[in-house]
Amino acid sequence: MTRVEDFFSKQIDFCKRKKKIYLAIVASVLLVAAVIGVVAGVKSHSKNSDDHADIMAISSSAHAIVKSACSNTLHPELCYSAIVNVSDFSKKVTSQKDVIELSLNITVKAVRRNYYAVKELIKTRKGLTPREKVALHDCLETMDETLDELHTAVEDLELYPNKKSLKEHVEDLKTLISSAITNQETCLDGFSHDEADKKVRKVLLKGQKHVEKMCSNALAMICNMTDTDIANEMKLSAPANNRKLVEDNGEWPEWLSAGDRRLLQSSTVTPDVVVAADGSGDYKTVSEAVRKAPEKSSKRYVIRIKAGVYRENVDVPKKKTNIMFMGDGKSNTIITASRNVQDGSTTFHSATVVRVAGKVLARDITFQNTAGASKHQAVALCVGSDLSAFYRCDMLAYQDTLYVHSNRQFFVQCLVAGTVDFIFGNGAAVFQDCDIHARRPGSGQKNMVTAQGRTDPNQNTGIVIQKCRIGATSDLRPVQKSFPTYLGRPWKEYSRTVIMQSSITDVIQPAGWHEWNGNFALDTLFYGEYANTGAGAPTSGRVKWKGHKVITSSTEAQAYTPGRFIAGGSWLSSTGFPFSLGL
């Protein structure tokens, strides 16, 4: 019994010892686990803290970049809030270029919203007048143009500054966004004819102005970024221009295609198609020839328009690029129509010929609107085509003859005749060696040669009249004292017009320029005159506005030559038309 008791007693002692050891081991394990947990927790907390610090640093840096980029815009609060309200914007912004790109993408969405709002308005608003319906369709067209321009600008920015020369990048980007701003104004301008129009305008105003401000901000940031980059480039390298111009040494530019070189070298251009009203060509109307022309053509497509009077409205849509209209002489080939505001059109839609597609050329043709002075706005030619040029063409109408709507344009050896605001719009347009004649207007009217429509100080737009002849037609000359004629008036706030090296007859009033409405734009416009001659050229009696300037420096005047103002050195040779790049 004792052994048994001893045995069990030992067994019990052994079990107790084993249990103690087991508990000790468990305790040790738990202690180690606890320590590991604490260490891991500390490390995790440290990592999370580091990650949070990194995120905060990135966010802070992105905010600083956005603030800096937006500080030079006209609407900095809108610029900043639009960007920082984008989800994860801090991950998308590492440079000023990123801010611009993001801003443009936001603007694209805003334009789309406006587009669908207009479509809905057309469907649902009762009692729209015929002109209001036309104006709303004008809005859809200009919004569509804006979307294309913004998308192209984004693509250009993604490759900036490596796709092409820095200067070309700069001019292209400024032109695209300047045109986008103009399009918003054009939409609203269609609703400015009567009180009913203005009610519809009020519905569209907020959305259109929002897009315009967003585009304005993008343009300001582009100007700031590119000005800095150009300054840096000039420090690093001496100015050089490897592109040789025909004007300089008789050689063709290296970027001109072989096909276009052959076309320009030929004394007689072989057309791709012929338009003849008498049925002797491929088509009877110009419109039909345009419809059948290839889209997005990379080579020149020549449409010869034989002698005749073509009574039609012609629209060259944006996809019909590189079209050239070649007439049989401006006295022989005439395209004419008579749409006008008085009969229910908008100014934009009244044009006999409208050109939107890029690189459209015309020579030896008359564009005419025969509506007459009593019908008010009636456009003969509306040009929104970038890198477009006109040679030996006549533009004949009364009020609003030539609408230089948007983009870069060049007119050489042309005649423009009209009455009120007969060269108007917001393109970057240069007239060289042209005749610009005021006609006899309606009773009580004054003639205004120009009405330039720049709305933003950063737009690269304006009207330049260089080496031209400004005078009067035969019907005005005998009665010109009864109908005062002026060089221009400010259609929009930052209106810009320069008259230089031109002959001006006494048809122009000594004051030279006329106000639009009281003091509107007199301080913000820029009206320059340089080295003009003739009885109407003296500047001593000119208006004393802050925005008027007599230019005395040839260096300053150079800024308004084709080579500088419309980057003519990179494209005018490809037209085959005569031109001078400088003074």
Swiss-Prot record:
Give the superkingdom in one word: Eukaryota
Under which EC number(s) is this enzyme classified?
3.1.1.11
Region (Pectinesterase U1) residue ranges read 272-570
- Top EC category: hydrolase
UniProt pathway: Glycan metabolism; pectin degradation; 2-dehydro-3-deoxy-D-gluconate from pectin: step 1/5
Is the keyword Hydrolase in the record? Answer: yes
Q: Where in the cell is it found?
A: Secreted, Cell wall
The record's Gene Ontology biological-process terms are:
cell wall modification; pectin catabolic process
Which cysteine residues pair off into disulfide bonds? C414-C434
Q: Does the keyword section mention Protein biosynthesis? A: no
Protein's name according to its UniProt entry: Pectinesterase/pectinesterase inhibitor U1
Q: Which organism is it from?
A: Solanum lycopersicum (Tomato)
Q: Which gene encodes it?
A: PMEU1
